[in-house]
């Protein structure tokens, strides 16, 4: 079985908290090795990946309503740069969006836009720090994504 890898960006700590909880759930419940990296910690340094991963992306927007009156993504562009660098997006099995439902149509909008731009699915979404139910549900979706890849190739890391 291959290591499960997460690449994400967290600014307020909500996404980091959720990634840690998902990682712990997968480790203890499914006995899988998990590795995660907050892209913010790279401080602009570029890295190339060589195996499957899942991304987590919070939504930070300013201006407009995000749909028909425009918007500007703020603070999370480093994840986009990471995905673009050396074609890293080709290894992304999907993205998990987070946001605040108070923002209506903008809830997790950035994750859906990244999915469209890069051609990978939105695996799931959660609000703010996520609930225990979110952790369990999303962990199952992540494991299913990795199992599909493992069925296609014989991976022994």
Which residues does each PLM region occupy?
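FMN-binding flavodoxin-like domain, especially the glycine-rich phosphate-binding loop
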Residues: 49-157
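N-terminal beta1-alpha1-beta2 submodule of the flavodoxin-like/Rossmannoid cofactor-binding fold
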Residues: 1-72, 76-77
């Amino acid at each position: 079985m291959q290591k499960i890898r997460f690449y994400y960006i967290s600014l307020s700590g909500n996404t980091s908290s959720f990634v840690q909880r998902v990682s712990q759930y997968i480790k203890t419940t499914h006995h899988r090795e998990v590795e995660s990296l907050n892209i913010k910690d790279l401080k602009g340094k570029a890295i190339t990946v060589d195996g499957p991963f899942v991304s987590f992306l919070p939504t930070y927007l300013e201006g407009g309503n995000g749909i028909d009156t425009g918007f500007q993504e703020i603070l999370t562009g480093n994840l986009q740069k990471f995905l673009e660098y050396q074609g890293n997006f080709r290894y992304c099995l999907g993205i998990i969006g987070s946001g605040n439902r108070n923002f209506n149509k903008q809830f997790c909008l950035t994750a859906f836009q990244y999915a469209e731009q890069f051609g990978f699915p939105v695996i799931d979404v959660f609000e703010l720090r996520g609930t225990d139910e979110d952790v369990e549900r999303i962990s199952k979706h992540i494991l299913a994504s990795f199992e599909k890849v493992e069925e296609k190739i014989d991976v022994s890391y």
